[in-house]
Amino acid sequence: MLFALIQASAWATTYTFASGNYTTVTNFTACATGPCANYTTSMQTSGSFTTAAPLAANLANQNIFAQVTSFSLSDGIVTYSSADPNSRVYSFVVSTNAAGQITSSQIVLEEWQSTPHTPPSRVAILELIASTASAFNNTACTADTTSPAGVADTCTAAIVDASGSSAQSTVLTSNIPNVPTVGEWGLVCLAGCMLVLAWMRLRRRQIS
């Protein structure tokens, strides 16, 4: 039983997001600076994040960033990834139901698109808030401080100027978590549990 309990706590869980195709698109009018690019209505937001253990049930607007081990989401133009040194987390807040499934989110990710990360450096922003996915490419950052998630060097205010583009979908779904992945320690514990069960069965046979 002890091995089983340890194994359960070692599960990593992946949560996926997908929006509908963008229904509102506003593209740049004059590319004066930065990586200008156009969104289209055939694009959408999609991706996932992984936590070290399944999210708890009945969370209410809880900051879960400390539990996130990796993330990767794309808005059709920009990919936001925990493996990218230019990606930043502004907010990673979710709510869950009694089964631990995400019912609402306030996830805001950023990608620095120019240096030196001071106004008016260019930044892309992806917002997954409630049932809406909003994407912003090549915006002008107007403030660079520490985010509410505790991440330094994050753009905390930005404007969409003539070089920027934006897109939005009012359909956003978060899928039921994939089957948890057993980590290294989970495999060790599982093997230990199987050895204990085998020993107990052998012991019973010897006694009988």
Model-found features: residue ranges?
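Short, threonine-centered small-residue motifs that mark membrane-proximal processing/anchoring sites
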Residues: F3-T13, S166-C189
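N-terminal low-complexity, intrinsically disordered patches enriched in charged
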Residues: S9, A56, G192-L195
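Tryptophan-anchored aromatic micro-motifs
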Residues: T13-N27, Q67-V78
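A eukaryote-biased signal for long
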Residues: V151-S174
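A cross-kingdom C-terminal cell-surface attachment/processing module
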Residues: E184-R204
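Cytoplasmic C-terminal tails of single-pass
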Residues: Q206-S208
